Amino acid sequence: MPIHQVTANLMPLIWPEAAPLLQKAIDLDPSAITIEQVEYGIRRGEYSLLVWEEPDAGITGAVTVSFQDYPMHRVAHVHLLGGKGVVKKHVFEEAMQWMRMHGATKAQCWCQDNLVPMYEKMGMTNTHKVMRIEL
């Protein structure tokens, strides 16, 4: 079950399958981003789009990732994650290997409290709380 990075030239072929998977993640907080903004960010290179396939099932999952450089770390930030099998160890291991190949030393994501258990199953730990105020 390989993970593939989707390059801009493959977007017309892959996006119709990946978009509904990512939309499920967007639906958890529709005020944060739209699927059109995600597509634009991928095409501009702000986010990388990864998809994974299952034999005889085709594309079953998608994730968007960006990289943030800090003095001590290069962080792979997962923005959206959707589809089947996202908590399977081999899926997460392959995604982490891709992140390492791109220089990341840590991976992170922001999520609502109800998703913390899912990410903990993947081996992630809850390290911060994000506080926000409207300006």
Model-derived features: positions:
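Short, flexible, glycine/charge-rich loop motifs used to bind or transfer phosphoryl groups or to couple energy/partner
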Residues: 39-40, 66-69, 97
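Acyl-donor binding region in acyl/amide transferases
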Residues: 73-122
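Short glycine-aromatic motifs
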Residues: 47, 121-125
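Conserved donor-binding loop and adjoining core beta-sheet/short helix segment
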Residues: 44-86
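Short amphipathic alpha-helix that is part of the acyltransferase structural core
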Residues: 1-33
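Conserved catalytic-core motifs of GNAT/GCN5-like acyltransferases
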Residues: 110, 125-135
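N-terminal start-of-chain detector that recognizes signal peptides
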Residues: 20-25, 35-36, 50-54, 79-80, ...
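Active-site rim helix/loop that mediates acceptor-substrate recognition in acyltransferases
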Residues: 28-47
